[in-house]
C-alpha cells in the first residue's frame, strides 16, 4: 500500500538496469513511493531508431505520469536520456532527471586512463564524445561498448550465475590500461562486484547512481531519512522472460510482482 503523504517517483528504463538507480535513491529516501516501469517490449533501446525511441518513451512515461500522479521522473537509461529528455521536459510540468556517464568525476581521480564501459549506442553517440571532449580532454579514455554485459546483468537478476571467463574476455581490452572505469549503463552496477573482480582492486569503478539520488533529493526538497520498507509497484510493457525468477529478486528489492502496462504505440 502506497503512502499518499510522500511524493511518487517514476523510474523508467528499457530493462531492469534502472533498479541500480532505484537502489541508490531508495537507500537515501526510503519514505518515497516508487513506481518502476520498464519497456521490455522494445529492449534493448540501443537498437531503436531515434524517432522510435522518442515515441515509445514519450508515450509510456506520460501515460504513467497521468495514471499514477507522479511527482518526479527518473529516466534511468543512458541511451534514452541522451535523446528524449528535452521532449519530456517540454511536455511535463514535473521534474525529469536523466542519466549521464560519470566522465567528469572520473577525470578528476584518474591518474592513468579512464575506461568507459557502456552500450555500443552510448559509446557511438555524439553526446558521449562531447562529454569526453569537455571534461576529459587531458585524459586518455578507452571506450568499450557491449550489449552482452547488459544481458548478463538481466540474467543475474533472474538468478543465473555470471560466467567470469566470458566477462574477462569482454573486458580484456581494458585490463592493465586504466585505473578508473565508468559504468556507463545503469545495468552495469548490478554486476559491479564481478566487474571489479575481473579488472582488479586497483581499478576504481564509478557510476551515476549516487549523483542521481542526490539530485532527486534536491528537487523534492526532502531530508534524507531512515524509514520502514514498503512495497512498491513495477510495470512492464510486455511479459518479462523468466518472470517468476525475476519476481523473487524484485521482492527482495521491495517490489510487488510485475504488472502489465500494455499500451499500443
UniProtKB/Swiss-Prot annotation:
Which Pfam families does the annotation name? Asp_Glu_race
Q: Which residues form the active site?
A: 77, 185
Residues reported to bind substrate: 13-14, 45-46, 78-79, 186-187
Gene3D superfamilies, A to Z: 3.40.50.1860
Superkingdom of this protein's organism: Bacteria
This protein's UniProt keywords? Cell shape, Cell wall biogenesis/degradation, Isomerase, Peptidoglycan synthesis
Q: What InterPro entries does the record tag this protein with?
A: Asp/Glu/hydantoin_racemase (IPR015942), Asp/Glu_race (IPR001920), Asp/Glu_racemase_AS_1 (IPR018187), Glu_race (IPR004391)
Top EC class per UniProt? isomerase
An annotated GO BP: regulation of cell shape
Reactions accelerated catalytically? L-glutamate = D-glutamate
Q: What is this protein called?
A: Glutamate racemase
